[in-house]
Amino acid sequence: MIKKTQGTEIRALARHIGMSAQKARRVIDQIRGCSYEQTLMILELMPYRACYPIFKLVYSAAANASHNRGLKEADLFISKAEVNEGVIVKRLKPQARGRSYPIKRPTCHITIVLSERPNFTLKNI
C-alpha cells in the first residue's frame, strides 16, 4: 500500500509593495508551480522590476521553512502564489495657474505558499 505523507505549507506575505498588481501578476504567473531553486533562477533572469520584491519574498519563505519547520529547501515548491490589489496612494502634483493634478500610485499584496513535495512510501501490510 502506498501512503502519501501530508505536506507542510509555509506562507509568506508582503504587503503594500509599490507597484501595480497587474505587473506583479505577470511575474507570479511564470513561477507558480515551480520548484524553489528553479524559481530563484527564473526571478534572477527576468528583466522586470517586480522580480526583486518577489525574489525577496520567496527567499524569506524558504528561510522560514528551513529555520522554523526544519524542511529542506530542495524539497520545496511554490504551491500557491497570488497578487491582490492594495490601497492606492494619492498625491497631488502642482500644475500651472494654481491647479493640481492627481497622481495615483497603486500598491499590491503578494502571497507565496511553499509546500514540500509529497513523499511516497511503501507501508508493510
From Swiss-Prot:
Q: Carries keyword Ribosomal protein?
A: yes
Entry-linked CDD domains? Ribosomal_L22 (cd00336)
What is this protein's record name?
Large ribosomal subunit protein uL22c
Physiological role: This protein binds specifically to 23S rRNA. The globular domain of the protein is located near the polypeptide exit tunnel on the outside of the subunit, while an extended beta-hairpin is found that lines the wall of the exit tunnel in the center of the 70S ribosome.
Cited Pfam families: Ribosomal_L22 (PF00237)
Any one Gene Ontology BP term: translation
- The reply to whether Transferase figures as a keyword in the UniProt entry is no
Q: Specify the domain of life of the species encoding this protein.
A: Eukaryota
Family recorded in the similarity comment = Belongs to the universal ribosomal protein uL22 family.
In which organism is this protein found? Nuphar advena (Common spatterdock)
Q: Which residues form a coiled coil?
A: none
Q: How does it assemble?
A: Part of the 50S ribosomal subunit.
Q: Which InterPro entries match?
A: Ribosomal_uL22 (IPR001063), Ribosomal_uL22_bac/chlpt-type (IPR005727), Ribosomal_uL22_bac/org-type (IPR047867), Ribosomal_uL22_sf (IPR036394)
**Hey, what's the signal peptide range on this chain?**
none
Protein location: Plastid, Chloroplast
Molecular-function annotations in GO:
rRNA binding; structural constituent of ribosome
A GO term from the CC aspect = large ribosomal subunit
Mainly localized where? plastid
Keyword list, A-Z: Chloroplast, Plastid, Ribonucleoprotein, Ribosomal protein, RNA-binding, rRNA-binding
